[in-house]
Amino acid sequence: MNKQSWLLNLSLLKTHPAFRAVFLARFISIVSLGLLGVAVPVQIQMMTHSTWQVGLSVTLTGGAMFVGLMVGGVLADRYERKKVILLARGTCGIGFIGLCLNALLPEPSLLAIYLLGLWDGFFASLGVTALLAATPALVGRENLMQAGAITMLTVRLGSVISPMIGGLLLATGGVAWNYGLAAAGTFITLLPLLSLPALPPPPQPREHPLKSLLAGFRFLLASPLVGGIALLGGLLTMASAVRVLYPALADNWQMSAAQIGFLYAAIPLGAAIGALTSGKLAHSARPGLLMLLSTLGSFLAIGLFGLMPMWILGVVCLALFGWLSAVSSLLQYTMLQTQTPEAMLGRINGLWTAQNVTGDAIGAALLGGLGAMMTPVASASASGFGLLIIGVLLLLVLVELRRFRQTPPQMTASDS
């Protein structure tokens, strides 16, 4: 057959046992992190009644993740990657235990939540970078595109399930249960990861880490195509930071604790559908234009989200944002792999991930600040429509990205 299917091809999970182990570990990890992602903002909102404080926690964690990604890129290129992955996961679990113990105190410490957020953000990003660096060795460079879509599906499905579980746990047992189960899940992920083969770094000349990073930055700034992709990715993650307003919007919509979980699950659900139906994305003749348009649509969805009179309609807007952002993100990933020289792939992937984290942190800080000056509804709408205006300007300015054309790859039987 030579007709390309809309559905994602999952054959890598059958043919590559090491990738299957990573798939399982990542799914458990995402569920665990989702429990954490619901608990932290709700706990801070309950303690402080301040959206600014909620945004600050996300910003601090994002800053720690950025540093961790930079350090992790250097470690992954110099040390055995399996050891880096295992060390990072185990250390994260210790931080989650700390959050659980803090939540059990008669008066939990807000400072402890912030400090443990820094701890977990830093060490979690070390593992992410090492896994990204190891993926070509696990699946083969020719399968990276398929592996990326499967990874997104894993992340999104886990992110759909965990917020709903987290919301139910909040309604029945409190945040300590969320933290405790997150710690347990993180340590469980070590079991499949222990089965990975040794993942030594590639041989390369010794270079000062800062010099290597600067070379990556220079390439990013000098390439209007790759640089434009990275810029869109940063803006897209800024829009996703709207989650810092969920607790306040939930009060506005008079949602129960269990219903709050649907807000956190909506974006991952839409993105999971986007990843599952991504079979034809790699065959788009004009991926740059499609990326720009899907990004604009996602900004519009966020702008409309806060204006919805009922929470269920807000969930629909968030799901639409998730679907459109998944389309844009998959196109970003694919074009970065194909348009970046092989010698730069590791650094550019690391910088792309880091700027996504930075965009999330900046977005959280801005939304937290807006939430202190405006109503939650006005804050959400202002962020979405503001990004939409910026996106329209980029549609006009990023000429090379908008006009980029590619020859659709040849389809094989396994693609159909």
From Swiss-Prot:
Keywords: Cell inner membrane, Cell membrane, Membrane, Transmembrane, Transmembrane helix, Transport. Gene3D superfamilies: MFS general substrate transporter like domains. This is Enterobactin exporter EntS. Component of an export pathway for enterobactin. It is a multi-pass membrane protein. It is found in: Cell inner membrane. One of its GO terms (cellular component) is plasma membrane. Belongs to the major facilitator superfamily. EntS (TC 2.A.1.38) family. PANTHER family: ENTEROBACTIN EXPORTER ENTS, INTEGRAL MEMBRANE EFFLUX PROTEIN-RELATED. One of its GO terms (molecular function) is enterobactin transmembrane transporter activity. The gene is entS. The chain crosses the membrane at residues 22-42, 56-76, 84-104, 110-130, 157-177, 179-199, 219-239, 257-277, 288-307, 314-336, 357-377, 379-399. Residues 43-55, 105-109, 178, 240-256, 308-313, 378 are periplasmic. Residues 1-21, 77-83, 131-156, 200-218, 278-287, 337-356, 400-416 are cytoplasmic. The keyword Membrane applies.
